[in-house]
């Protein structure tokens, strides 16, 4: 007899999309860019959308992070 794939009594955890927090305490703000912070040696953009911050993936170049932030801003302007 084959075993069932799932444990029968284990509850199914429903997925809740993660809301990124504001930039953490140890992030260093870059003065030359509007939304870019340095985090663990990488460049990360934080954009406030509505009530919450959206965080970009880590980029190795600050310009890329800022481009991402600009794109997110544009998308949200269209959505509003």
From Swiss-Prot:
What GO terms describe the biological role, i.e. biological process, of this protein? cell division
Query: What cystine pairs are annotated?
Result: none
Q: Which InterPro entries match?
A: CedA-like_sf, Cell_div_activator_CedA
Q: Which GO terms describe its molecular function?
A: DNA binding
Q: Which UniProt keywords apply?
A: Cell cycle, Cell division, DNA-binding
**Pfam families in the cross-refs:** CedA
Q: What does this protein do?
A: Activates the cell division inhibited by chromosomal DNA over-replication.
To which protein family does this belong? Belongs to the CedA family.
* HAMAP family in alphabetical order: CedA (MF_01580)
Q: What is this protein called?
A: Cell division activator CedA
């Amino acid at each position: 007899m084959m075993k069932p794939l799932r444990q029968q009594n284990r509850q199914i955890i429903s997925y809740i999309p993660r809301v990124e927090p504001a930039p953490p305490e140890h992030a260093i703000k870059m003065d030359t860019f509007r939304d870019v912070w340095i985090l663990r040696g990488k460049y990360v953009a934080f954009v406030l959308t509505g009530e919450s911050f959206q965080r970009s993936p880590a980029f190795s170049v600050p310009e890329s992070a800022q481009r991402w932030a600009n794109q997110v801003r544009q998308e949200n302007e269209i959505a509003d």
